[in-house]
């Protein structure tokens, strides 16, 4: 970059201002990254808990299903599953976590399986349907939590790349520019000082010469 800038005092001031801005920007991005990392690890715990809950309710639901099939006819089980088939709606909003847009999902209260169960369906089959409704809710929680986790993870990577670009490329480049400009300005100052000293020395020699000549003329007149 040094070859693309004019080594002037105004350029030096501009480079110093750019260095201050870049350094401040890197600090802000690092604070954001640290906050996101803290949020990420908190979400990891939530995601693991959601997965564990899903595994637990799934196991219970399949146990209920096997029991229902043992006590009720396959037709009864199938009829309840068809009766409970409908669109599953969730209340989803978008929230911002340190500038990252993530979904916030609220699961509405669902209708009990007994409310839409056909006639001649046993309690075990109704319980199985209820348990699988709980599984569906657990799946939604897992999806929401892992979506947050993925988006925050992507933002951490993006922020880290920006920090690295500032610290490894931009800031060193600006510092190189400042060193270059200072070097040129210092060299110019030394050259100017040397030139002024030569002029001063020349003027002093001429003055001494004039004084010497004046002294000679005075002696001759006497």
Swiss-Prot record:
Coiled coil residues, start to end: none
Cross-referenced Pfam families: ATP-synt_D
Keyword Ion transport listed: yes
Keyword DNA damage appears in the UniProt entry: no
Annotated GO MF terms: ATP binding; proton-transporting ATP synthase activity, rotational mechanism; proton-transporting ATPase activity, rotational mechanism
Keyword annotations of the record: ATP synthesis, Hydrogen ion transport, Ion transport, Transport
Record GO biological process: proton motive force-driven plasma membrane ATP synthesis
Family: Belongs to the V-ATPase D subunit family.
Its job: Produces ATP from ADP in the presence of a proton gradient across the membrane.
Entry protein name: V-type ATP synthase subunit D
Species of origin: Deinococcus geothermalis (strain DSM 11300 / CIP 105573 / AG-3a)
Chain's gene name: atpD
